[in-house]
Design a protein with these regions (language model features):
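Alpha-helical protein-protein interaction modules
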Residues: 3-7, 12-15, 20-28, 34-37, ...
Length: 213
């Protein structure tokens, strides 16, 4: 999992993305039966925002090895960003069933909570986001997701508390305003998903006390 995360990070940060893409393609060509090679290619494609291609690459990973647990959570993320919110939760639940003690399980809880939040299932979102907070109490984004969910559920004081924690825990000032958050993150998925963020996550943050500017 660390290797794949490293590939994803480098793909986002490097100025030589074409080289990484080429190397990932060469790895698949050299070892077409290697789940790891396909996983590396999928992570690069995801970092490029080529989510449909990334999903196909993740599918190849699971075709080769159904027990490659990181692929389930990563394909769920790719599907969510591509607008397939309904497909996200079963995939992450499968990852949790296969590896409940995974050190990144808190991120998986958060992803399920976020998917519920985007579909306006606020009560279920809160359940999963509270689990995520318990698993990773210092994760700023989880606190922000929970702030939004609490606010949408009418729990404004708890929402304000979580938003304050998100601001304290963040390594930058992204939670000072909606404009700053949107600028720092940059890409919020396909138009369908962006509309869901606006109707749920951003709306909740406004109710929690986050200003526009």
């Amino acid at each position: 999992m660390c290797l794949m995360t490293g590939i994803d990070s480098r793909a986002r940060e490097t100025s030589s993305l074409d080289i990484i893409t080429h190397v990932a393609g060469q790895a698949v060509a050299a070892s077409p039966r290697s789940a790891v090679a396909h996983m590396g290619q999928a992570m690069v494609l995801r970092a490029q925002g080529r989510f449909e291609e990334a999903i196909r690459a993740y599918d190849a990973v699971l075709t080769l090895n159904r027990n490659f647990v990181p692929a389930y959570a990563n394909i769920a993320y790719a599907k969510l960003t591509a607008g397939s919110t309904e497909d996200t939760i079963p995939l992450v639940e499968q990852a949790i069933r296969a590896s409940a003690r995974d050190p990144t399980v808190g991120n998986w809880y958060d992803l399920i909570g976020e998917a519920h939040l985007l579909q306006s299932r606020t009560d279920e979102a809160i359940i999963w986001l509270e689990r995520a907070r318990s698993a990773i109490p210092t994760h700023a984004a989880i606190r922000a997701h929970l702030a939004s969910a609490y606010a949408l559920d009418g729990e404004t004081q708890r929402a304000a508390t979580e938003l304050t924690e998100a601001r304290k825990l963040s390594s930058n000032d992204r939670y000072t305003s909606l404009a700053r958050l949107q600028a720092v993150v940059g890409y919020w998925g396909v138009p369908k998903l962006r509309a869901l963020f606006e109707a749920t996550y951003f709306a909740g943050l406004r109710k929690a006390g986050m200003p526009e500017e």
